[in-house]
Structure formats: structure tokens, C-alpha cells
């Protein structure tokens, strides 16, 4: 037992976590006036922590490991079994370089261009519709774009099914019951679909282009010179495609931010890429996306009067850190201007994780997320006019991942002249 830090007295907090969602850690760090506390989750003792200093410690690879940290239920829905998110050391860096090679600025630019093309093509159909649900449209467009960019053949008739499978994997993360099992069923379907392509590419039955995600995953060699087995290559290719489709959550929150804070429409119209970047960053900070991340203590150490024993499970609060008043002035206000003079910090703005993408566990696709969001924001602000009919735009911080209940319905869509 760790006597130096607060202990949550509940026998097990698993159900409470599902009830409180994004606020589970934040509620307790505020209650105990402490950046860390101990609680029982899933029948085990966890240390939960928040803040930039905690993030700095959490991303110290000498102190923490990811191997064996992810519950099987998360591997079997969201990430895939034994994928990059659970690797450490030189093997992790070697695999990470593969992902980073696919997410360079030219790749980011290409994806943003493809998004713009797809958005513009969608308007013709939207103009004839009474209304459209932005989330449904965004996930299919992102799926189409991600597969095309990655070199993954995708028939138009299967776009909806594949997009739904990717989103179901994401939606299963914070769920029990039907939502979780929907994601569990989606994963093997997607893995089998992609594995056939990996095998066909290796057999020369499917032509691939060097530099595309399909080609690079199919022919990647590990540190020992061997190729990934075809199922693992499929899992890692899904770890490229699925997060791109998941940007649809951020795109809906961007539209919600424009609706709830209409003064920024004019601000964006009279601005340029810099204003778009600030707006996008504030959407990523303010609205809920990843709630927390887990790791295991690699070796005994003491931090902040707390003993971290080898093998202890630790959760880092992403949402709470992004809303920490010590790091953010009026954190519960939506204010893109806060990024005008803000210096970059690897540990205070962590919607997709913290630290270095190259050497650590920060999401390698963060640049893609930002560029796709900027291109989509530009489309919403400069390319179309639309109405927002009465609907439930409420989103619950108890639901992980969260999304406005209506998916953001738009009506009367027309091209700007």
C-alpha cells in the first residue's frame, strides 16, 4: 500500500469509471487536492495521475513500459493483439519508424488534399438532400480517403461497412455490453479483409506502390530481418486506417464549435492557415477524445512522495490535463486565441498522448489529424452554407468516446457562390 498518496476507498471503481467517464480521474484529483491517487479498477490497484509533470514521468521509457499494460478487451477491439501500442524498447522504435515514414508532411498534405476533393464532391449530393448527418458522412469520406491514400482497394459498395467497422472498434473502447461486442466482432472482420490483401501483395497477385501504407506494411522487415506475419501486418495497417477514420469525431466537434461560437466563423473567414491551426488545436484540447492512457511501472522509483513499484498499473489523465487550470487559463472556455503566443510543450497538450512521437509513445498520426481537420474546417467555413436544425447536440462526458447525440445534422446545404 502507498501511504503517501490519497486512496479511493471504494472496493472497486470499474463501474464508477464507466459512469463518470472522462471526469473519473479529474473528479478525484480535485477532491483529494493531489495530482495522483490510488484506486482499485478491474480488481487491481492502479495509480491515477494528472498534469504536465505527471505526463513527463509517464512518458519516461526508463520508468514505464507498455508491454502487458493494455487489457485484452482493449486489444481485441481497439488496437489489435500485440500491436505497436504494447511494444517497448528498440523493437518499438523500429516499428514506430515505419509508422512515422507514412505520416510525413507530404503524406499529411496529400491526405488533406484528398479530403478537400471528397468534401467538394459530396456537396452535389448534399444539395439534393433535406438534411445530412455530418458524422455519418465524415466517417465514410475518411474511410474512402484513407484507403485510397494507403493503396487499399475499396469498392464503393463496401465503404459504409468498412467505415462502420473502424468506428465500432473505436466506440468499443469505453463500453461494456453490446457496444463493446460490436467492436469485438468488427475487428476480426477487418483483420481478415486486410490480411488477404497483405498475402496477395506478397504473392504478386495485388500490385502495390512503394511508399503506400499497404506496400510498406506488407514488406516491412523487423529487426531480425523477418517480415511481419500476415495477420500482424494487417493489424498494423488497421492501426493506420482506423485512427484516420476516427478523425470524424474531431470533425463533428469542429462543426459544433462553429455552431456554439459563431463569432469564430468570421474570424476564420478573414484569417488564414494560422487561424485554422489555432481553432483546430482548441477543438482538440477542449472537446473529449482520448480519456486516459495506461502503462506499467518498469522499475521501482519514487516521484511526488509516491512509491511506484515495478509492475504497478498507472493511468494518465489526458482529458484532465487538457483542462488543467495550472496549464490553461480558463480551461473550460473555448478560446482558440490562447494558441497565438503559446510555446509548444510536449506534456501539457495531450489529446493524442504526450512526449516525442519519434522516441516515445505519442501518436504518430497527430500531424495527419491536424491537417485533415484544417482542410475540413476550411471547407465548412469557406465552401458551403448550411443550416443547423433543432436537434440534440448534447454530448456526455460519461460516454467514452463522446459525440453529440445527433451526430450533427445539417440542412439546406448549398455551395458558396
Swiss-Prot record:
Binding-site positions, heme: 363
Known catalytic reactions: a 1,2-saturated fatty acid + H2O2 = a 2-hydroxy fatty acid + H2O; a 2,3-saturated fatty acid + H2O2 = a 3-hydroxy fatty acid + H2O; tetradecanoate + H2O2 = (3R)-hydroxytetradecanoate + H2O; tetradecanoate + H2O2 = (2R)-hydroxytetradecanoate + H2O
Keywords for this protein: Heme, Iron, Metal-binding, Monooxygenase, Oxidoreductase
EC number: 1.11.2.4
Disulfide bridge partners, by residue number: none
Signal peptide: none
Protein's UniProt keywords contain Metal-binding: yes
Cofactor: heme
A family per Pfam: p450
Homology family: Belongs to the cytochrome P450 family.
This protein's name: Fatty-acid peroxygenase
Gene: cypC
Amino acid at each position: 500500500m502507498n501511504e503517501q498518496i490519497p486512496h479511493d476507498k471504494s472496493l472497486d471503481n470499474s463501474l464508477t469509471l464507466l459512469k463518470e467517464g472522462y471526469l473519473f480521474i479529474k473528479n478525484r484529483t480535485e477532491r483529494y487536492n493531489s495530482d495522483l491517487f490510488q484506486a482499485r479498477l478491474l480488481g487491481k490497484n492502479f495509480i491515477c495521475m494528472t498534469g504536465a509533470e505527471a505526463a513527463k514521468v509517464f512518458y519516461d521509457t526508463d520508468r514505464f513500459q507498455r508491454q502487458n499494460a493494455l487489457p485484452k478487451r482493449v486489444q481485441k477491439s481497439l488496437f489489435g493483439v500485440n500491436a505497436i501500442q504494447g511494444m517497448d524498447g528498440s523493437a518499438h522504435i523500429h516499428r514506430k519508424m515505419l509508422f512515422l515514414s507514412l505520416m510525413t508532411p507530404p503524406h499529411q498534405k496529400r491526405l488533406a488534399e484528398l479530403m478537400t476533393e471528397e468534401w467538394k464532391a459530396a456537396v452535389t449530393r448534399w444539395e439534393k438532400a433535406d438534411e445530412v448527418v455530418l458524422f455519418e458522412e465524415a466517417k465514410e469520406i475518411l474511410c474512402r480517403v484513407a484507403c485510397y491514400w494507403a493503396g487499399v482497394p475499396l469498392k464503393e459498395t463496401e465503404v459504409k461497412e468498412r467505415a462502420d467497422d473502424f468506428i465500432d472498434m473505436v466506440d468499443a473502447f469505453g463500453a461494456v455490453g453490446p457496444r463493446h461486442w460490436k467492436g469485438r466482432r468488427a475487428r476480426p472482420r477487418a483483420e481478415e479483409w486486410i490480411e488477404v490483401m497483405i498475402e496477395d501483395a506478397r504473392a504478386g497477385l495485388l500490385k502495390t506502390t512503394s511508399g503506400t501504407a499497404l506496400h510498406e506494411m506488407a514488406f516491412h522487415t523487423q529487426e531480425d530481418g523477418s517480415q511481419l506475419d500476415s495477420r500482424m501486418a494487417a493489424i498494423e495497417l488497421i492501426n493506420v486506417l482506423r485512427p484516420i477514420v476516427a478523425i470524424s469525431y474531431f470533425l463533428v466537434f469542429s462543426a459544433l464549435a462553429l455552431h456554439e461560437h459563431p463569432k469564430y466563423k468570421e474570424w476564420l473567414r478573414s484569417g488564414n492557415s494560422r487561424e485554422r491551426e489555432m481553432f483546430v488545436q482548441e477543438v482538440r484540447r477542449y472537446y473529449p477524445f482520448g480519456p486516459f492512457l495506461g502503462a506499467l511501472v518498469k522499475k521501482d522509483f519514487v516521484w511526488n512522495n509516491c512509491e511506484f513499484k515495478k509492475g504497478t498499473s498507472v493511468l494518465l489523465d489526458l482529458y484532465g490535463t487538457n483542462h488543467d487550470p495550472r496549464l490553461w487559463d480558463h480551461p473550460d472556455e473555448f478560446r482558440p486565441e490562447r494558441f497565438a503566443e503559446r510555446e509548444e510543450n510536449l506534456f501539457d497538450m495531450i489529446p493524442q498522448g504526450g512526449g516525442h512521437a519519434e522516441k516515445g509513445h505519442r501518436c504518430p498520426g497527430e500531424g495527419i489529424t491536424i491537417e485533415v481537420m484544417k482542410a475540413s474546417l476550411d471547407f465548412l467555413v469557406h465552401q458551403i452554407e448550411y443550416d443547423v436544425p433543432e436537434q440534440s447536440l448534447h454530448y456526455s462526458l460519461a460516454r467514452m468516446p463522446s459525440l453529440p447525440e445527433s451526430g450533427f445534422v445539417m440542412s439546406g446545404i448549398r455551395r458558396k457562390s
